[in-house]
Amino acid sequence: MLTSSMPQNLSLFGFSPLKSSSFALILRPFSLYPPIFASSSPAPSRRPPRTAGYRRSGPSPPRRKWSSFEEQKRKGRSPMEKDKAISFNHSSDSFEFNKRRAEGLDKVDKPKKNLKRNTRTLNPTNTIAYVQILGTGMDTQDTSPSVLLFFDKQRFIFNAGEGLQRFCTEHKIKLSKVDHIFLSRVCSETAGGLPGLLLTLAGIGEQGLSVNVWGPSDLKYLVDAMRSFIPRAAMVHTRSFGPSLNISDSAPQIGLSKPKDDAYVLVDDEVVKISAILLEPSRLEESGSKPGETAVIYVCELPEIKGKFDPKKAMALGLRAGPKYSYLQSGQSVKSDFKDITVHPSDVMGPSVPGPVVLLVDCPTESHAEELLSIPSMKTYYSCLDNSTDGAKLVNCIIHLSPASVTNSSTYRSWMKRFHSAQHILAGHEAKNMEFPILRASSRITARLNYLCPQFFPAPGFWSHQHDNNSINPTSLSKCFDSNLGESISAENLLKFTLRPHGNLGVDRSSIPSRLTALRVMDELLSEIPEISSKTEEIKQLWNGQHNKMMIEEPWLGESTVPSCLENIRRDDMEIVLLGTGSSQPSKYRNVTAIYIDLFSRGSILLDCGEGTLGQLKRRYGLEGADEAVRNLRCIWISHIHADHHTGLARILARRRELLKGLAHEPAIVVGPRSLKNFLDAYQRLEDLDMEFLDCRNTTTTSWASVETSRPEKNTSSGNAEGSLFSKGSLMQSIYKRPSSPLTDNSSALPFLKKLKKVLGEMGLEHLISFPVVHCPQAFGVSLKAAERKNIAGDEIPGWKMVYSGDTRPCPEMVEASKGATVLIHEATFEDALVEEAVAKNHSTTKEAIKVGSSAGVYRTVLTHFSQRYPKIPVIDESHMHNTCIAFDMMSINMADLHVLPKILPYFKTLFRNQVVEEEEEEEETDDDSLIRDKVPSFFIN
């Protein structure tokens, strides 16, 4: 137990994270004092490590140089000897491993993966084949829906927008079975989920998987950008087609010499032929396309089904049963056995059934639609032309990914009329889908939390009870055009069009999920937990004046009153919205990391921006409210380069640029690690992001000092937050102090620092300070502090202070930066029993995160970034949660409600008492069911 008599200044103990003796203090378990004060190491977990998602899959890597518990057990050591060995090894070898990891050398001696592609024996007859709408973005309109082309032995996906992994996890669609991914355009709307998907596939199994990725020539730009954080092996099968854009050969390119109007054959086997037809906007003067403008029409043609062989006809033509029957069925003519004639296959075979043809059309603008009418290679598929046209093919289904503004235009309708009998499925953004949450599991959790505590979990507009009775009838938009266009329906999530067997050819609605509404969720909740309504009333009383006195007098607050910075604080001062609270990769219940700092009329800041952040904003604020939230973004801060913290950034910035187009505005300021700039610079060749970049190293305490003096920063060792990790001569300094690093010369960053200072002042903030943490190279935490304000009496009172850890092991820099914080948001990836895994992956356990807050004297600590092994709620020792709360997606913490926060935690215990721990992937399941059952029905240790 830490006592107030112990000194807080770690420099008194000669602490340095680059000394093995110092790392012994923080790595197992975390303690701010010498080993004599540290508690004994917790027992190792019996559970196998879970997939790390974006960064690693499968078992944890072997601990280099130190002995694992399993090795010690095999060596037959006694418990006492084992404890001594662990303590000794950890003080030296753990340091060596973490030092190598901080230097980025932990993978040098790790053999590189040669990712394999799926190879399967194809089945030409395909007893089952269909196309299916994967409704990503159909409720939030933040991304393009995907389309799955399914065969017995092959899978093809068209478009990989943000949220695709999360969607497939919930609906049990195995992405590991996917062979090819096709992009109809190369932009954040259609490819926002591709980086995370490639990383996840690369981590499957011992060898990892790689898929073929196809797209127009713009794909080269995306590949160049992704190289900054995705292994090259994961992208070796990316292929672009179409005219070259005169850039580096990042991806192999096919069809360079073909006329642009010709179709490019991408896949042609016994199962399917997939061709691509380029579609560019019409131009009066300019020639050539700009990056991001090229769209693609994909044509999927299945082989014909040969007619049935008729043995009676064969016998009548003088053929005896034998090998000649097989020759005829294979298409060869044979001589009759008893007649002087030649028997042709058509004489004995029934009529063949033409193979189905499916078109996927992405026509993003009316300018593209004008060109659509004049594409020569499309004439083969028009049924309105003369039936005598050679090679005419009947199109069975057309999936329109085009927006409603285009499909409703007269130009587009005239093109659609050329396919008389085709089934049209309109999969663009349709308003009716707002009433049908696509991510049902997380929507159900959010609705339950909203019922329990609407103060911390407000519901968006389309989840409110008022909208339940006014929703649009799902069949009201089914018929979209006149009868001359054939049958046209609006796409719904998981809608299928069956291609095989031929007898079932057509639309199949059997997989469409039933409608989920807030009222339905409430009925389920009240039936499951009848006393939840009384708990809701108890929570309401926490905001009453009669209960405030009780809360202030709670002995565990550590203060006689709430902090002075919260005195008479207004509700429009600041609100923390936790958009994503999971780690590694998206799951059914938690998205990856993103925190929206709402300063209301003064603007907003985003701390980290994992994949799907824009969609989460729309689920929190509604469609119009989310657009306003994006418009108000002034600054985006990224902690480190791991994909679960930044792959939603391009989509957010692109949407902001789109919303502010034509309006007077300033570019968004993006603060992040230097490696992020490499990604953004490369990506902006594809899509303008309207941003300015500032390295986190330029926003440390010493860098801000250079703004005050208007002189370049001189690197000196000091006692500030970054001093111990980057002290003169340290190994960490050698990592970052390179000729191109802003640490060497801060002069180029001064204009951007001054601009950031101006923006912070306009938002009522005194500072934004980044500080290094122990996770990976160029990993940072951040501190935000509000400016002083006057109370009712006119007295100056300090502004609040908020600190966010990013991903980190507990470290003195984290404690130092958190001193006096009003609220600390700290990662707590692992439960306390998994400290070994936390050390190996440079993350924190829940107890360690809480210790950081208590050691720094933080008023409130919010735990986040939970491992996805905990589907709904993490394993928590409730006795440590005196001034702490756990975070959920969509949780909104207003500074005016901060004093109530810890009192809510026990009510979560009631809400989730009947929930069980779910392992979301079959590969993760263990035989030790008792281990899982030990953690239910309660997720707390009383």
UniProtKB/Swiss-Prot annotation:
UniProt organism field: Arabidopsis thaliana (Mouse-ear cress)
Record carries keyword Disulfide bond: no
Record field: catalytic activity: Endonucleolytic cleavage of RNA, removing extra 3' nucleotides from tRNA precursor, generating 3' termini of tRNAs. A 3'-hydroxy group is left at the tRNA terminus and a 5'-phosphoryl group is left at the trailer molecule
Stretches the record annotates as Disordered: 38-85
Protein name from the UniProt record: tRNAse Z TRZ4, mitochondrial
SUPFAM superfamilies with a match to the protein in the record: Metallo-hydrolase/oxidoreductase
Enzyme class of the recorded protein, top EC level: hydrolase
Record flagged with keyword RNA-binding: no
Names of required cofactors: Zn(2+); Ca(2+); Mn(2+); Mg(2+)
EC number: 3.1.26.11
Domain of life of the source: Eukaryota
Localization (cell): Mitochondrion
GO cellular component, one term: mitochondrion
Effect of loss of the gene: No visible phenotype due to the redundancy with TRZ3. Trz3 and trz4 double mutants are lethal.
Transit peptide: 1-50
Subunit structure and binding partners: Homodimer.
Family, similarity comment: Belongs to the RNase Z family.
UniProt xrefs under InterPro entries: RibonucZ/Hydroxyglut_hydro, RNase_Z/BN, RNZ2-like, tRNase_Z_dom
Alphabetic keyword roster: Calcium, Endonuclease, Hydrolase, Magnesium, Manganese, Metal-binding, Mitochondrion, Nuclease, Transit peptide, tRNA processing, Zinc
